[in-house]
Design a protein with these regions (language model features):
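Conserved catalytic cores and adjacent C-terminal regulatory segments
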Residues: 1-214
Length: 214
């Protein structure tokens, strides 16, 4: 889980390995989730204390620097003691959706500082997310590794939904659930292939063979 410490001015990464190794890196999961999703203007800064109460952080949403944290997850996985290679790491990256906003040249060329505020935030988030997706695709492709990384990112402009984070109306929640179901339907073959490969890597046999042995 990525988050940003505004008091110390640094990116923080929470993971299980650190929690097991060091008591001052052990935090309650609910508090880590609260901190890593504390989006400015939507939620207040989260004050997070570790289990020993000896260290604290003042945290905001990790999306401020890692809107798509897939590469962060990859790097954290590389820290395991057995030093995994890309061939040992499988990543299913799930995006929350993009509106695919564009800004025509004729209008944007006349914008001033105030008019650019919202577009800059939108571009920063979407471009950063796309960059991570591109980098991971190239990383796996250059290693000649197939079917171990893929990303699902719905284009919300194709659906009747609101992308606003604070729109929690029943209608919008149901619409977003429908988008999720549609994405599963569209990517079902890839999801099956991915989960099957993951299963084989962990169990050592095909899922149907495992259940026959049971």
């Amino acid at each position: 889980f990525p988050a940003y410490d505004v008091e110390h001015g640094e990116a923080i990464f929470f993971n299980q390995m650190n929690a097991y190794r060091e008591v001052d890196k052990n935090f309650l999961v609910r508090e880590v989730i609260r901190a890593s999703t504390a989006a400015p203007t939507y939620f207040p800064v989260a004050k997070l204390n570790n289990q020993s109460k000896e260290e604290s952080y003042s945290l905001i949403d990790g999306g401020m620097f890692a809107n798509n944290p897939a590469f962060c997850a990859y790097v954290e996985a590389c820290k395991f003691p057995f030093q995994p290679s890309p061939d040992d790491i499988m990543i299913l990256s799930l995006g929350t959706g993009s509106k695919g906003k564009t800004y025509p040249y004729e209008s944007s060329k006349r914008w001033g500082k105030v008019r650019w505020v919202v577009p800059v935030i939108d571009i920063y988030g979407s471009a950063g997310s796309q960059t991570v997706d591109h980098q991971l695709k190239v990383l796996y492709r250059c290693q000649h590794i197939r079917d171990q990384y893929f990303r699902i990112e719905p284009d919300l402009s194709q659906f009747d939904v609101s992308p606003l984070m604070d729109n929690v109306s029943t209608k919008n929640i149901k619409a977003l659930e429908a988008v999720g179901e549609k994405m599963v339907e569209e990517h079902w073959d890839k999801i099956k292939a991915f989960t099957r490969k993951l299963y084989i890597s962990q169990i050592g046999c095909q899922p149907d063979e495992f259940y026959r042995m049971k």
